[in-house]
Amino acid sequence: MTKVRKRLFLIALCVITVISSLGLSAYAASPEETVSALRNEPTKLICVSKYGDTAHYPENSIEGIASAVQKGADMVAVRVKATADGELVLMSDDNLSRMCVDSQGNSINKTVSETGIYELHEYFLKSGKGGVSQTATEYKIPTLLEALQAVDGKTVLLIENAWEYKDEIYTLLSDNNRLNSCVLMLEAGKKEISSWLSGKSAMPIVFSKFKGTVVWKSRSYINRTVNAGVAGVLLGSSNAYSMTFNKNTVAKAQGKVRAVIDMTDPNLSGKRADTQLYWDDVTSRGFSVIITDNTEQLSEYSKRTENARARLSELCDVASKTDLTLCSTYSATNLKNRLTVSKDVLSSSVCANALENEYYELSKALNSLNDRSTDDKNQKTVTKGRVVAAVLVAVGFVIVEIIFERYRNESIKLRKVGRKLYGKAKKK
C-alpha cells in the first residue's frame, strides 16, 4: 500500500473509532425501538431486568422498574397474580408473607387470591427480594395497569407467567391499547399456544418457553411455536451440556425469532453464572435476549457489543469501497476473503470479543494491501502463462525420467549379455 493510501486508511479508522465512541453512553431503548428490534433486528442484544432493580427497590415495584430502565434495561420481567376481586397485581408468589408487611411491620400470611385490592393497597413491600431478614419499605403493590401507566413510553414489560392469566391480560392490554407495551411469556405446549393465538384479532407480542434436554423435542417446539407467530423462544435446562444450548438447536430460532435465556435461574441457564464470561458464551451460541439480575453491567456489555458491531460494519463499508485495481493479487484476494468472513460475523448473533477480533483481522487485511509492482516480486501471481510453464516443466521432468529409465534398463540387459558371453569364453 502506498504512503497516501496508508494515511487515508488510518484516517478512516480514526473516524470510525471517534464516531463509534459517541454511542457508548448507556441508555435504554424506547419501547418502539425494542419492539422493532425484536421483530426486525435479530442480532441486536436485548437486556431484560429480572423484576426491576432489586438491589435498591422491592421486586415487581414501579420504583424498581423505573430504576432498572435508568440503568439501561430494554425490558423488565415481572410476574402477576389475580386478587380476590379480579385485579391483576405485580407479585411473584401467591402467598404474601415473603414480600409484604402491614403498617405494624408484621408479615402477612395470606394469599393474593383471597385478598381484595383495597386491602392489598394497605400493605407495604419488603426491600429487595423480600424474606425474613428484609425490612419494610414505603412502596406499595402496584396493579398491572398502574405499572403500565407508570412506565408508558419508557420500557416494555415481560410478563413471565402470562399463560396463567392469558385471557385477562390480553383483555386488559387490548382495552387500554397496550398490546405493544408487553411481551407475554407463554409456558405451554405448542398446540395450546397455537390454538390460543389463532383466535386473536390483534396479535400480542409473545415468547414461548421450553425447558428440557431432548434435542428433537426442543427443535420441534421451536418450529411449531415459530409457525404460531411467537417473537421469541426461551430455551432452558439445568444441564450445562444439554443440546438445548447447542448452536444447531439455537440456529433453528435464529433468523426467525429471538433465542431467549434466563441467566438468573441456574435451572434454566445450565448453571451458568450471570456474568460477562457466560454472556460471551450464550451470545456466541446465538442467544440474543438475556434476562439478568445485573442490569447495569449487561446494559454496558450490550452497548459494547453494539459498538463493536457498528465499528465492524463501518470497516466493512471501507473495505468494500477500497479500489483494489493496483493492489497485488495476493493482498487483494486476502482482503476479499476476510471481508466475506466479516460479513458472516455481522449477520450472526456473536459475542463482543468475536466482533472485536474480527475488526482486528479485517483491519490487518486492509493494512496489508500492497501495490502490484512491489509485492508481486515476492508473492508470485498465478497466471495462465505461469500455469502452462509449470505444466511444461513437469512434462519435461517426466520425459527425462522415462529416457533415463530406458537407458538404465538397456544397460542392465547389456551387462547380463556380457556376463553370459564371458562365461562361455571361459569354459572354452
Where are these regions (language model features)?
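Alpha-helical transmembrane segments
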Residues: 16-19, 394-402
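Cytoplasmic C-terminal tails of single-pass
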Residues: 409-428
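Hydrophobic H-region at the start of alpha-helical membrane spans
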Residues: 12, 386-396
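Phosphate-group recognition and catalysis centered on beta-loop-alpha active-site segments
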Residues: 20-307
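Short, low-complexity interaction segments enriched in Ser/Thr/Pro/Gly
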Residues: 3, 377, 381, 417, ...
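Bacterial N-terminal signal peptides
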Residues: 11-23
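Beta-rich interaction/scaffold domains
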Residues: 305-389, 400-408, 414
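Bacterial N-terminal signal peptides that target proteins for export
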Residues: 1-12
